[in-house]
Amino acid sequence: VDPNDPAFSKPSKPIGPVYTQAQADAVAKQRHWAMGPDGKGYRRLVASPKPVSIPALNAIRWLLAHGSLVIAAGGGGIPITRKPDGVGMQGVEAVIDKDLCSSLLAIELQADRLIIATDVAAVYLNWGQADARALVNTTPEELAGYAFATGSMAPKVAAACAFVRATGKRAVIGSLEQIEDMLAGHAGTQISPIAYQVAS
């Protein structure tokens, strides 16, 4: 990650145990942590910087080229920056968004498709409301005109759109249970540079 990413000045991702307000105030004072409400209590907030490179990319490429099934970018990976002297790396207290990291990995590997599997069938407009409707076939430009939930669907949409813009290839967001149909173009929200008709 970039040590100058503006996210470091605006911690937003809750991590760790849940505290009462009194406990959160004490921990914040003692450890100089940002704290914020989360559900029924308070949790530590850390930055969520944008991933800019994947140091293990060559190893991942080599493993793929030699027939390995590679599991990478789980949970977004471990955030690191270059040391101030430019030699070596150091860990930073942050959380990398798993969807943006997966998108970056797919772009760097020149993947044929990015599939973001989740627990809903598609990207919905007006999610949770009576007039909710699934987006079936869309483009990054169309999606830019809508607002999605910050902590759930927004990063998935941003990641899928980044992949489509960078590669000109298709991305899909939908249910893990429908992954084969998503790959075939029969399910999920299909995102491509130009809208197309979903295969029947």
Language model: regions and residue ranges:
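C-terminal catalytic "cap/lid" subdomain
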Residues: 1-200
